[in-house]
Amino acid sequence: MLPFKTLALFLLTAVAEIVGCYLPWLWLRQGRSAWLLVPAAASLALFAWLLTLHPAATGRVYAAYGGVYVAVALVWLWTVDGVRPGPWDWLGVAVTLCGMAIIAFAPRGG
């Protein structure tokens, strides 16, 4: 899979997972409607389905996806929660994305 398509798929997967977890959080922590559990379940089902679209071995996909998840979660922190990440947050994301790139795009023998 091309690097751009892989990254786009990772981004969609991360957003689906975060939305699927954020909606129950709104229900449990902020007293929002229990009806939020319906789109949350759909979002988590989408998340699981998106994971099946990655062509690499599942362990490698989960490891590489974790790096993208960290980056998307930090952007979520900023845009949805209104908390601006600091320099150490961004450094952590950079290190994580370097690891993700190595795992996802390193040449493989065989």
Swiss-Prot record:
Pfam family, one: UPF0060
Subcellular location, record wording: Cell inner membrane
HAMAP family reported for this sequence: UPF0060 (MF_00010)
Taxonomic lineage from the root: Bacteria, Pseudomonadati, Pseudomonadota, Betaproteobacteria, Burkholderiales
Recorded family membership: Belongs to the UPF0060 family.
Species, as recorded: Acidovorax sp. (strain JS42)
Protein name (record): UPF0060 membrane protein Ajs_2087
UniProt cross-references to InterPro entries, sorted A to Z: UPF0060
Record's bilayer topology term: Multi-pass membrane protein
Chain segments annotated as transmembrane: 7-27, 33-53, 63-83, 86-106
SUPFAM superfamilies attached to this UniProt entry: Multidrug resistance efflux transporter EmrE
Gene Ontology CC terms, in alphabetical order: plasma membrane
Keywords for this protein: Cell inner membrane, Cell membrane, Membrane, Transmembrane, Transmembrane helix
